[in-house]
């Protein structure tokens, strides 16, 4: 779960970190769901409870490590989309490559995606190099419009871009016996039969990813024997501070 800034938590390990004005979240798995909790299911990061507003879908976005491309990516699931570095991405767009210090906005909530100083595959990390391709995305300018961006009249964008998302509670259909969950927008998720419907990876999937990840680490010269060793090493190199020009609400 996301931790409030200043809560005194000693848990500072993860492959990546989400940092907002008033919360931080350390990724300790290779795939997390951002959205809002409901009576039927929970998500890894409940943005609604963090002040994300009424435009948060129950399953709004997924951040995951793409083992094929060896990078973190964002998959947009919620109909209101996500902003990454001021560009709106909608469901059906290609997955978005995430670089360290990328600014994300979902609903009224702004936060940074941060990686350790050194890549999990070796080599220093730098900020995003912007290359505009032919992807069907909608640009949005002036997302650093002034202090307090993300809420109120001086927020980074108008609420008119959004639809009120009150229909998500019926959005999922259980396909009994198939282990699949389908959303009306065509996306599918998979969960083990009989387990509580939590939008996350199964234990078997996580363990398989752990083994694959450790193999990549050994190939990159990292002397670690278990996944906790990777967490600790990455946490020790974690990006603790954001340059002043990248802080939330900076004019």
Swiss-Prot record:
SMART domains: FHA (SM00240). PROSITE patterns: FHA_DOMAIN. Its main location: nucleus. Residues 163-174 have a biased composition (Acidic residues). It comes from the Eukaryota. It is found in: Nucleus. The keyword Isomerase does not apply. Expressed in roots and vascular tissues near the shoot apex in young seedlings. Disruption phenotype: No visible phenotype under normal growth conditions. InterPro entries: FHA_dom, Fhl1/FHA1, SMAD_FHA_dom_sf. Residues 182-206 have a biased composition (Basic and acidic residues). Keywords: Developmental protein, Nucleus. Residues 32-89 form the FHA domain. One of its GO terms (cellular component) is nucleus. Residues 163-209 are annotated as: Disordered. GO terms for biological process: regulation of ribosomal protein gene transcription by RNA polymerase II. Induction: By auxin, cytokinin, gibberellin, abscisic acid (ABA), brassinosteroid and hypoxia. May play a role in the control of plant organ development. Does not show transactivation activity in yeast. This is FHA domain-containing protein FHA1. It comes from Arabidopsis thaliana (Mouse-ear cress).
């Amino acid at each position: 779960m996301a931790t409030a800034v200043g809560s005194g938590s000693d848990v500072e390990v993860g492959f990546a970190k989400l940092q907002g004005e008033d919360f931080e979240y350390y990724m300790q798995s290779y795939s997390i769901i951002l959205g809002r909790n409901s009576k039927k299911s929970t998500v890894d990061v409940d943005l609604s409870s963090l002040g994300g507003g009424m435009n948060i879908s129950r399953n709004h976005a997924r951040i995951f490590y793409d083992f094929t491309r060896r990078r973190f990516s964002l998959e947009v699931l919620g109909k209101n989309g996500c902003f990454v570095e001021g560009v709106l991405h909608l469901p059906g767009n290609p997955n978005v490559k995430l670089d360290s210090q990328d600014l994300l906005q979902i609903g009224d909530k702004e936060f940074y995606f941060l990686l350790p100083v050194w890549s999990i595959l070796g080599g220093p990390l730098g900020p995003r190099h912007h290359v505009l391709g032919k992807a069907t995305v909608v640009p949005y300018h002036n997302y650093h419009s002034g202090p307090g961006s993300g809420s109120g009249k001086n927020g980074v964008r108008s609420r008119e871009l959004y639809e009120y998302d009150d229909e998500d509670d019926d959005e999922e259909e259980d396909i009994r016996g198939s282990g699949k969950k389908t959303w009306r927008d065509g996306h599918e998720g998979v969960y083990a039969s009989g387990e509580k419907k939590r939008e996350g990876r199964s234990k078997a999937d996580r363990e398989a990813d752990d083994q694959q990840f450790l193999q990549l680490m050994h190939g990159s010269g990292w002397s670690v024997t278990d996944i906790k060793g990777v967490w600790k090493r990455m946490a020790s190199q974690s990006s603790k501070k954001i340059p002043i020009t990248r802080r939330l609400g900076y004019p």
